[in-house]
Amino acid sequence: MGKPAFGRSLLFVSLVVWLAACSGGLFAQSLQLSAPTAAPGEWVAIEMALKSPPGKDILAMQWEMEIPARQLDLANERAMRAVIIVQDAGKSVTCAVPKETRDARIMRCVLAGGQKPIPEGKVTSLSLKILENAQPGPIRVRLQNAVAVSGDLERVSFDPVETTVTVQPR
């Protein structure tokens, strides 16, 4: 039982590790962003959807959005809104822009309130105006530093996620 047995054992261990890695992604928490399309001068909405970890109700969340300032405009810090089902759970969203440069705005948001969990699915909508001088093509918007607290008061981290706002030609 020399090399062939070792090879089969290595193959088996590799398969188990691969399956564990794949299934972990299937059951992990995640955030997703919609990818809107519009022309310069028009408004778009980026919707954020939540997938909670199994057996973990999310009570509150915090995240940052990196928004390219030369192509997209925030009307104000109230541009982020909780959807109706989230409001019905007693939650509200509050945002601020703690960092702003010529190239980008960092918008930090907190979604919290009440004792009910945040329902899975669409949770917020961010309204942005495509600036008149925006060139046709994709504009990258990034959600980062997202963390949540579960019903059992455990910290839940989320991977960064990106989307694109596609600017159509006029």
Stretch-by-stretch model annotation:
Residues 2-13:
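Bacterial N-terminal signal peptides that target proteins for export
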Residues 25-170:
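Acidic, low-complexity intrinsically disordered segments
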Residues 11-25:
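Bacterial N-terminal signal peptides
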Residues 1-4, 168-170:
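Generic detector of intrinsically disordered, low-complexity segments in short proteins
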